[in-house]
Amino acid sequence: MDLKALIRDIPDFPKPGIMFRDITTLLSHGEGLRYTIDTLTEKCQTAGLIPDYVVGMESRGFLFGVPLAYQLQAGFVPVRKPGKLPAAVHQVEYELEYGTDRLEIHQDALADHHRVLIVDDLIATGGTAKATADLLEKIGCEVLGFAFIIELTGLGGREKLPDVPIITLVDY
């Protein structure tokens, strides 16, 4: 199946010069969504990525992470932006182009022996994915790999990540 045909290109969003890859059209296509989850599952299994938990990055990582966790018979844990989780959290601060941001995870969500797979819709520069891996490693988890629907090649995101399997379905 041609997933690129199901991903809408929006020029100049969110600012001029950016080509936004809109996955809402993929999400609304039942057969395409099923193919996406089935293909991610197959690629994870083939690569030996059998986690205890799938960790979804806010917020589109939740959309693919939950069904992937179900298929892999794993739990799902969200990583959120600051102030979105109600209980005590672990957090990590990371650099943005202009400033810093934080990611948080509930303190009781994972333990130091858990094996995790990190999932998001897209990898560009890799900053948020690396920060997520740093957060999980800080609490003692083993990061098995990453799974993304889209990779924006040429932005160096893959090179910032730990040396583990990285699964992508569509490259731009």
Swiss-Prot record:
Coiled-coil spans are none
The answer to whether the entry has keyword Transferase is: yes
Catalysed reaction, written as an equation? AMP + diphosphate = 5-phospho-alpha-D-ribose 1-diphosphate + adenine
The alphabetized UniProt keywords are:
Cytoplasm, Glycosyltransferase, Purine salvage, Transferase
Q: In which pathway does it act?
A: Purine metabolism; AMP biosynthesis via salvage pathway; AMP from adenine: step 1/1
Its domain of life?
A: Bacteria
EC nos: 2.4.2.7
Query: What InterPro entries would the database entry show?
Result: Ade_phspho_trans, PRibTrfase_dom, PRTase-like, UPRTase/APRTase
Q: From the Swiss-Prot or TrEMBL record, what is one GO molecular function term?
A: adenine binding
Give me any GO biological process, just one.
adenine salvage
Q: Please state which protein family the record places this protein in.
A: Belongs to the purine/pyrimidine phosphoribosyltransferase family.
* PANTHER family from the UniProt entry: ADENINE PHOSPHORIBOSYLTRANSFERASE
The record's note on quaternary structure and interaction partners says: Homodimer.
What functional role does this protein have? Catalyzes a salvage reaction resulting in the formation of AMP, that is energically less costly than de novo synthesis.
Q: What is this protein called?
A: Adenine phosphoribosyltransferase
Species of origin reads Rippkaea orientalis (strain PCC 8801 / RF-1)
